[in-house]
């Protein structure tokens, strides 16, 4: 409830039409969010231009990340362990666990080959190996692969995926945020100039209201495909036989109007870019953070981190919490949703979209600055009595609700306050390992990163007392067995003496027997 109050106080009530950023896709290629992933977006650039006047400028850029992706495989490795705890004071106790293990390139290539040949096989947990008075581990090194496609940066040819360290990778083998997982592909990428270029509506901001001020301090530019960015330090750079400009954040665009382009190109303060310059696509953090108010930035970050903290600690989250994770500016970024109690994502390009209100009867919106009305989304998942889509958007009987934008309008209802517990993606072998456990009433637990049995001598004694019932029964069994054994030995001795023939005493007068003495 505190997060609702903070956000309501921080923003002005939104009445009527609203402008948001929304994924360009209408459905997602969903994947589970990795455990170490912790993305928080930059604050919205809505007021970054302050009182500057906007001048419409038609731009062109390489086509967005709508179709460009490359196929590959995630290679997962784990140590599957069966632990036998057969201490002298207790009964035999068996546990199963899996542990992170970094795969080798050779292991992964062999696993990928087996997968393609249709002969991949998971043997499961190794058989137990028990020795009296010991704790023994039986180990199996298991490597599996799963198909996993990633997006492609049209400018650099780099692979883009939240699993990669830093979100990007170049090459046929990529490290991931999981130390037990690598990504493999046989693709060399595509030629960056094979992309189609698309027109985008842009606005140049300046106090002087003149295009000739481009490149000077206190000027900036934004479009439906990227957030407000300062034009100070802009330089001229050709790309794929097209004359264009590179901003200081390495974003490239071309001005379509020949007269405007010539005016800007002839400005003396706009120089040619260095020959070694590189360019990138609008990324997840493209906003110039120095232009965003500290209060808004800190508040957005705190609300986002609060959501990740809830997920990490297993606390329930609401659609409003989930909406804090979504990007606030146009460009490439992750889309989040909840599927079967797990947090999922996919990567899309965000566009500026205008909505009639935070609750709409049809899932449609108008691309900002145009007359184009488009279907926004068409994939929903169960969430209590309603359905949930991207970044907390809800499909209800009353219409489609955008929780983040309902806050502060007086329309807050029970739908956007529904809570559900969601989980990270811990290790891909966990789900498979569950199928190898017993399905009886023993309630066997699968341990991750720990065998569930301590080998520390002090903790062994503590374990004796923590499991005192089973340990006591084991000790009593040993004592009773020892007593029974002693009784049997004594009984055998008694019976032996009873059935042994008695020796007749020999007297000296017995001449015949005395002869043998």
Curated annotation (Swiss-Prot):
Iron as UniProt keyword: no
Residues annotated as site: pH sensor in the pre-fusion state: 76, 178, 427
Species of provenance: Vesicular stomatitis New Jersey virus (strain Ogden subtype Concan) (VSNJV)
Site (Involved in the interaction with host LDL receptor): 63, 374
Residues the record marks as carrying a glycan: 179, 340
Transmembrane segments annotated in the record for this chain: 475-495
Protein name: Glycoprotein
Function: Attaches the virus to host LDL receptors, inducing clathrin-dependent endocytosis of the virion. In the endosome, the acidic pH induces conformational changes in the glycoprotein trimer, which trigger fusion between virus and endosomal membrane.
Originating gene: G
GO terms for cellular component: host cell Golgi apparatus; host cell membrane; membrane; viral envelope; virion membrane
């Amino acid at each position: 409830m505190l997060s609702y109050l903070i956000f309501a106080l921080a923003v002005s009530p939104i009445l009527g039409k609203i402008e948001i950023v929304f994924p360009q896709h209408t459905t997602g290629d969903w994947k589970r969010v990795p455990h170490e992933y912790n993305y928080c977006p930059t604050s919205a650039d809505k007021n970054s231009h302050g009182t500057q006047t906007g001048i419409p400028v038609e731009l062109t850029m390489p086509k967005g990340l709508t179709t460009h992706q490359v196929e590959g495989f995630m290679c997962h490795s784990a140590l599957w362990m069966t632990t036998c705890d057969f201490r002298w004071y207790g009964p035999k106790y068996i546990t199963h666990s899996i542990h992170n293990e970094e795969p080798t390139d050779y292991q992964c290539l062999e696993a990928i080959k087996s997968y393609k040949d249709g002969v991949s096989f998971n043997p499961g947990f190794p058989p137990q190996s028990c020795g009296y008075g010991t704790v023994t581990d039986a180990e199996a090194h298991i490597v599996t692969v799963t198909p996993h496609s990633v997006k492609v940066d049209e400018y650099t040819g780099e692979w883009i995926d939240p699993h990669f360290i830093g979100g990007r990778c170049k090459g046929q083998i990529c490290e991931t945020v999981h130390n037990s997982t690598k990504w493999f592909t046989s693709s060399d990428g595509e030629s960056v100039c094979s992309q189609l270029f698309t027109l985008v509506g842009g606005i140049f901001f300046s106090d002087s209201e003149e295009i000739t001020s481009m490149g000077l301090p206190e000027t900036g530019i934004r479009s439906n495909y990227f957030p407000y960015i300062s034009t100070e330090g802009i330089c001229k750079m050709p790309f794929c036989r097209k004359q264009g400009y590179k901003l200081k954040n390495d974003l490239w665009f071309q001005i379509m109007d020949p007269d405007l382009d010539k005016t800007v190109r002839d400005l003396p303060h706009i120089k040619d870019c260095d020959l070694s310059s590189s360019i990138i696509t609008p990324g997840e953090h493209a906003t110039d953070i120095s232009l965003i108010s500290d209060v808004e930035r800190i508040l957005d970050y705190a609300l986002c981190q609060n959501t990740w903290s809830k997920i990490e600690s297993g606390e329930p989250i609401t659609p409003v919490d989930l909406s804090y994770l979504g990007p606030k500016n146009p460009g490439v970024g992750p889309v989040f949703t909840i599927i079967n109690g797990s947090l999922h994502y996919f990567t899309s390009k965000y566009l500026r979209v205008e909505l009639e209100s935070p609750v709409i009867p049809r899932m449609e919106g108008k691309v900002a600055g145009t007359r184009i009305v488009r279907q926004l989304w068409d994939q929903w998942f169960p969430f209590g009595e309603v359905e949930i889509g991207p970044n907390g958007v809800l499909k209800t009987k009353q219409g489609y609700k955008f929780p983040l934008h309902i806050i502060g309008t007086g329309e807050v209802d029970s739908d956007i306050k529904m809570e559900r517990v969601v989980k990270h993606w811990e290790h891909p072998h966990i789900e498979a390992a569950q199928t190898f456990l017993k399905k009886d009433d023993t309630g066997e637990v699968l341990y991750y990163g720990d065998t569930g049995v301590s080998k520390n001598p002090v903790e062994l004694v503590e374990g004796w007392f923590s499991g005192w019932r089973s340990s006591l029964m084991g000790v009593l069994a040993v004592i009773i067995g020892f007593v029974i054994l002693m009784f049997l030995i004594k009984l055998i001795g008694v019976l032996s003496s009873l059935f042994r023939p008695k020796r007749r005493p020999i007297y000296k007068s017995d001449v015949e027997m005395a002869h043998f003495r």
